[in-house]
């Protein structure tokens, strides 16, 4: 049935709503192995009545949501009451709760402790990066909802347990799942049954620190910083130091039999050479693509800020002055190396940050949409938004001088080799809005996000610059929740009138 042809007919409108109700009510939690049928068909549940569009929520039925939060529902009601643009209200209501609605698995362990698995969406595994970003916007509500606080606590503890298991892994399987998908067990690395994938990415160890620190700052709950926390921190420090490559290549290698060049590493799994200069090597980017030069600059900035947060916790909560000092010394070393090796004197933009370097003098001048990115440095708080080098870098990455910036008839933004040419990631558009100090620029970004959802009411991994109906990943919870985070931040920053002018 094509709902675009429904006009002023109560019978047909009622029938459409009945079909929707049946579709929602007949789903169960296993339905979320594929949410395409209820959530992603363009315009499937956008009805028109007297030439006015009626937007029907694309959230799953209450009984089918994987996790319920009174605080999140209250925040949705609070925000939607303030927004006058019906389509923007609809998109916010769809996107902001997508993580808890469709990806959170909360468990209570035998000892009564909290344990939360946060799937990335259409892939049934928990990335340390994605999970830390997916639940991040809910932390501000933790004191208003005990169930939400326990879910967040369980996420952090699960991240600590994962780091204890293997600090080099980026994604983990659900130990409560009786039939996990061991898709990458044939990878030539130290794979374990508990792992989904073992790509070494610096940010995998940073996102848990960022989340734990913010949870502690908001709630004051220090109960998460016990034995598992200390073991995880030991692994984080040991891994960061090993990947400074001062004592050789280190223990980590990775190879995969694949047709994708960036899904494996050169030089027998060790990657391209680096010169030990104090920076931390990252075999892969936050896109899960192999680095060209292993000193990945945005991730090294992220490591500095994360280590400083960890040092504060260790000093204040654990009274572990030695480990806190170890974090601070390492952060100082990496920060000094960044100032020495990460800056490029660009003939057009002046001093900018390179995306990757190798310590030998080689620099890669690009940006990739995935966060941490050069554009997202200010969003993560790794640099001041008014830092002149950051502003120069921001101008560079949002231009056609960045090889992975694409501009078309549908939109513009940064992509990356993970999806390829001409594919813009909405995440980059959101990062431009997050880091903007210009109302016209922010408004332009929001309008572009609204215009490139292919009529689905959700964010996607990427869309074609000339045709948003050509998109990848129909169910990518991180980008959905990030959109909700952006709208809330803009309202908190006094930008409601801007949003209501769209």
List the model feature ranges, each with a label.
Residues 71-85, 133-146, 207-222, 301-320, ...:
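Well-ordered alpha-helical scaffold segments within catalytic/enzyme domains
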Residues 187-193, 198-200, 364-384, 422-502:
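C-terminal capping/lid segments that line or modulate ligand- or cofactor-binding pockets
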Residues 124-152, 156-263, 477-491:
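Aromatic-rich carbohydrate-recognition surfaces in CAZymes
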Residues 111-118, 179-199, 261-295, 359-360, ...:
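Acidic/His metal-coordination segments adjacent to aromatic residues that form catalytic metal sites
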Residues 31-129, 154:
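Low-complexity, Ser/Thr/Pro/Gly-enriched N-terminal "stalk/linker" regions
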Residues 128, 164-168, 172-175, 237-304, ...:
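Extended ligand-binding clefts on enzyme/binding-domain cores
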Residues 91, 146-162, 222-241, 310, ...:
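Extended, well-ordered alpha-helical scaffold segments
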Residues 12-21:
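Bacterial N-terminal signal peptides
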């Amino acid at each position: 049935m094509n709902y675009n042809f429904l006009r002023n007919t109560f019978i047909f409108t009622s029938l459409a709503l009945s079909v929707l109700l049946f579709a929602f009510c007949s789903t169960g939690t296993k339905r979320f192995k594929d949410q395409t049928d209820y959530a992603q068909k363009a315009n499937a549940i956008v009805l028109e009545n007297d030439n006015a569009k009626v937007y029907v929520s694309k959230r799953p039925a209450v009984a089918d949501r994987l996790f319920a939060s009174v605080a999140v529902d209250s925040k949705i009601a609070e925000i939607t009451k303030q927004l006058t643009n019906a389509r923007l209200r609809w998109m916010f209501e769809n996107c902001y709760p997508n993580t808890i609605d469709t990806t959170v698995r909360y468990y209570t362990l035998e000892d009564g402790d909290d344990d939360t698995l946060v799937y990335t969406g259409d892939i049934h595994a928990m990335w340390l990066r994605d999970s830390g970003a997916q639940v991040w916007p809910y932390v501000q509500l933790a004191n208003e909802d005990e169930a939400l606080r326990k879910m967040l606590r369980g996420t952090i503890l699960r991240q600590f347990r994962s780091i204890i298991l293997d600090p080099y892994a980026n994604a983990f399987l659900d130990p409560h799942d009786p039939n996990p998908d061991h898709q990458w067990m044939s990878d030539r690395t130290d794979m374990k049954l508990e792992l989904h994938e073992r790509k070494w990415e610096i940010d995998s160890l940073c996102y848990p620190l960022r989340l734990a620190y913010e949870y502690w700052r908001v709630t004051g709950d220090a109960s998460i910083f016990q034995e598992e926390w200390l073991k995880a921190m030991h692994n984080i420090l040991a891994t960061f130091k090993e990947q400074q490559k001062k004592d050789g290549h280190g223990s980590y290698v990775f190879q995969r039999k694949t047709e994708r060049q960036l899904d494996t590493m050169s030089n027998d799994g060790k990657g391209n050479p680096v010169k030990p200069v104090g920076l931390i090597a990252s075999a892969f980017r936050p896109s899960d693509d192999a680095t060209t030069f292993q000193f990945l600059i945005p991730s090294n900035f992220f490591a500095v800020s994360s280590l400083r947060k960890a040092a504060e916790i260790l000093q204040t909560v654990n009274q572990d002055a030695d480990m806190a000092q170890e974090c601070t010394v390492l952060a100082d070393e990496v920060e000094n190396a960044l100032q020495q090796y990460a800056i490029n004197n660009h003939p057009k933009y002046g001093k900018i940050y390179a995306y990757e370097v190798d310590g030998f003098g080689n620099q890669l001048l690009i940006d990739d949409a995935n966060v941490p990115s050069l554009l997202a440095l200010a969003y993560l708080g790794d640099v001041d938004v008014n830092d002149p080098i950051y502003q120069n870098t921001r101008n560079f990455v949002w231009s056609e001088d960045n090889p992975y910036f694409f501009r078309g008839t549908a939109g513009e933004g940064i992509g990356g080799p993970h999806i390829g040419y001409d594919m813009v990631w909405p995440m980059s558009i959101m990062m431009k809005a997050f880091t903007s100090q210009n109302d016209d620029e922010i408004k332009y970004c929001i309008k572009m996000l609204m215009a490139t959802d292919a009529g689905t009411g959700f964010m996607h991994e990427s869309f074609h610059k000339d045709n948003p109906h050509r998109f990848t990943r129909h169910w990518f919870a991180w980008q959905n929740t990030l959109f909700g985070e952006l709208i809330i931040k803009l309202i908190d920053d006094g930008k409601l009138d801007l949003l209501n002018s769209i």
